[in-house]
């Protein structure tokens, strides 16, 4: 391999499952064409007295390597995790790696609220018939257990929760585990958060989730950074990244996707959903500092961009304060919806695939940007080779995270 002055940590495998496609090729194709799956949600346990708009996964295709018995007992979130992890695992050729040197960090919590609520409704008057398997599956750690069981991971595994920043928290933890030497390879998995209508009602009452304003035209509901936005629109998704040191990747003969060159976490000391301008500025600046990048080095931003009334405004103010309004910017959630715990990883995957395709996807429904001085990618995808990207995630409870992603296309060939 050629010797390159790369940052220490790289991505060697990617897996993604979302409403717009299972697998990175279908996902990338949908992103670049702006193809979406927004509709009034129909999955059992999601509708009652209100109409909630979202982007649901139509079906899952299961690889042969997965245990059919395990799949029958697993929750929907766990099944999505297994198929997503399989794609990343096989691309990174981890069957040949030492399983005791592989770790797994799962981003998220409360993964199966919809199924939990259905269990309650079904068995509230006959609790003696509840399956013993529910004693395992209602715990978040069961998702770790299922994945480590199926793939023989014996290094480490745990979950990290940070609301909608959970995915990026998992990525940062995975980076730290690799750099500490605890494991050689660590998988960050953003798990599918399976909402019931109860969570949808509460999030709508909180003013976070979109109303039924667009129920008769669901394709127009998800509109981050647009003046007519109406709150976030939920989108089922799951993403996985295989993260390792560059030396490990090159020794194993792998060509990395990109380097994770900088990252930061900052708390606001606030349990409410309110965003913090200071917190967002802090993580942007610290991530750039760790990556040894200047603001002008960033040429693409993948923002948190949910379509919330206050959050979108604050995020653009933070980017402007950090002198980043020159960079191209688009909103992945305008196509995928908001994956909540999975969003941070799914959006880093969006960055990696746009790097690979040398193209930027459009932002749907960005008819009237709240600030048209930014360098928006609007109605159509464009050809562009990203050099340095910044991805942001924020979560309820004062969570702010940022990750810098460096294109290393010229650093992976044979010498």
Swiss-Prot record:
It is found in: Cytoplasm. Its main location: cytoplasm. One of its GO terms (molecular function) is 3-oxoacyl-[acyl-carrier-protein] synthase activity. Pathway: Antibiotic biosynthesis; bacillaene biosynthesis. GO terms for cellular component: cytosol. It catalyses: malonyl-[ACP] + H(+) = acetyl-[ACP] + CO2. It is an enzyme of class 4 (lyase). Residues 6-407 form the Ketosynthase family 3 (KS3) domain. It comes from the Bacteria. GO terms for biological process: antibiotic biosynthetic process; fatty acid biosynthetic process. Belongs to the thiolase-like superfamily. Beta-ketoacyl-ACP synthases family. PANTHER family: 3-OXOACYL-[ACYL-CARRIER-PROTEIN] SYNTHASE, MITOCHONDRIAL, POLYKETIDE SYNTHASE-RELATED. Involved in some intermediate steps for the synthesis of the antibiotic polyketide bacillaene which is involved in secondary metabolism. It decarboxylates selectively the malonyl group attached on the acyl-carrier-protein AcpK (Mal-AcpK). This is Polyketide biosynthesis malonyl-ACP decarboxylase PksF. It comes from Bacillus subtilis (strain 168). The lineage of its organism: Bacteria, Bacillati, Bacillota, Bacilli, Bacillales.
């Amino acid at each position: 391999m050629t010797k390159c002055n790369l940052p220490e940590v790289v991505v060697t495998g990617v897996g993604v499952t979302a409403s717009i496609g299972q697998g990175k090729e279908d996902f990338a194709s949908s992103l670049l064409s702006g193809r979406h799956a927004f509709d009034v949600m129909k999955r059992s346990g999601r509708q009652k007295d209100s109409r909630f708009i979202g982007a649901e996964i139509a079906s899952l295709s299961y690889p042969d390597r997965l245990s059919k018995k395990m799949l029958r007992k697993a929750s929907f979130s766990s099944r999505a995790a297994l198929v997503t992890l399989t794609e990343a695992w096989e691309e990174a050729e981890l069957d040949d790696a030492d399983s005791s040197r592989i770790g797994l960090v799962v981003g998220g919590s409360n993964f199966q609220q919809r199924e939990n609520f259905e269990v309650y409704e079904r068995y509230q008057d006959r609790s003696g018939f509840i399956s013993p398997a529910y004693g395992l599956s209602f715990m978040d750690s069961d998702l770790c257990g299922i994945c480590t069981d199926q793939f023989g991971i014996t290094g480490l595994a745990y979950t990290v929760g940070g609301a909608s920043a959970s995915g990026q928290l998992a990525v940062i933890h995975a980076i730290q585990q690799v750099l500490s030497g605890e494991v050689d390879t660590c998988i960050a998995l953003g798990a599918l958060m399976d909402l019931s209508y109860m969570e949808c009602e509460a999030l709508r009452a909180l003013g976070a989730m979109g109303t039924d304003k667009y129920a008769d035209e669901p394709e127009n509901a998800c509109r981050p950074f647009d003046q007519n936005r109406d709150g976030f629109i939920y989108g089922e998704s799951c993403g996985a990244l295989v993260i390792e040191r560059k030396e490990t990747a090159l020794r194993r003969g792998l060509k990395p996707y990109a380097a994770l060159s900088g990252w930061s976490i900052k708390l606001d000391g606030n349990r409410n959903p309110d965003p913090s301008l200071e917190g967002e500025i802090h993580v942007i600046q610290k991530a750039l500092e760790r990556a040894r990048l200047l603001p002008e080095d960033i040429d693409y931003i993948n923002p948190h961009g949910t379509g919330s009334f206050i959050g979108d405004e604050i995020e653009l103010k933070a980017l402007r304060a950090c002198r980043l309004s020159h960079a191209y910017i688009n909103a992945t959630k305008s196509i995928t919806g908001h994956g909540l715990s999975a969003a941070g990883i799914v959006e880093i995957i969006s960055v990696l695939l746009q790097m690979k395709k040398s193209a930027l996807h459009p932002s749907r429904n960005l008819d009237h940007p709240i600030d048209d001085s930014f360098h928006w990618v609007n109605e159509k995808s464009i050809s562009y080779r990203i050099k340095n990207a910044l991805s942001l995630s924020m979560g309820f409870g004062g969570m702010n995270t940022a990750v810098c992603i460096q294109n290393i296309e010229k650093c992976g060939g044979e010498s």
